[in-house]
A protein has these predicted regions:
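Hydrophobic transmembrane alpha-helices and immediately adjacent juxtamembrane helices
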Residues: 1-180
Length: 180
């Protein structure tokens, strides 16, 4: 176990650079850049609130908060696992040239999506304040479930990345599975 921790520590700078690269690549050639991580959840929440609020006749003022919180969590898991699935295969050229622990690629994918997810949580906090749910100390309890979500996403992502190396169709199957 100590050897694995030492290996991880030795490659921490590479992990940091891979996370930075992932964020930059996600928003390159985009006029708004990382602002999309704030705008996209807002626009999706508005559409879903109008559609489902009208469809179900929901008049609860906190309904958009429920929609946004569920959507942000699911979106992070889906994006994190999708990008992890392709991460080892997309970096195969570097893996063949230089020894790097292969788990760094799925981990960096999960981490950069987690950072984007944390930025998106700003929208959730603002919507909570707007709907009258002001931040309290209880909001800090969200840290543990988010850590569990991060670990679960990494676990699923590394399994999918391993399968994705040998079975390229897994990318399409996983996209379908996420829609279920």
């Amino acid at each position: 176990m100590k050897k694995r921790i030492d290996t991880f520590w030795r490659y921490r700078n590479l992990l940091f650079e891979l996370v930075k690269k992932g964020i930059k690549l996600k928003y390159r050639r985009s006029y708004l850049g990382i602002i999309w991580s704030l705008l996209e959840p807002v626009m999706t929440t508005i559409v879903l609130t109008i559609v489902f609020g009208t469809l179900y006749g929901n008049k609860d003022h906190t309904f958009p908060l429920y929609i946004l919180s569920g959507r942000l969590l699911y979106s992070y898991f889906a994006q994190g696992t999708k990008v992890s699935l392709k991460s080892i295969r997309q970096n195969s050229a570097m893996i063949k040239k230089v020894y790097v622990p292969k788990y760094l690629y799925p981990l960096s994918s999960v981490l950069y999506n987690f950072i984007i997810f944390l930025i998106s949580l700003i929208v959730l906090v603002l919507l909570g304040i707007f709907t009258g749910n002001y931040p309290t100390l209880h909001w800090l309890l969200i840290a543990f479930p988010l850590l569990v979500l991060l670990i679960m996403t990494f676990g699923v992502g590394i399994i999918l990345a391993t399968i994705g190396v040998f079975f390229r169709d897994m990318e399409y199957l996983w996209s379908v599975a996420l829609m279920l």
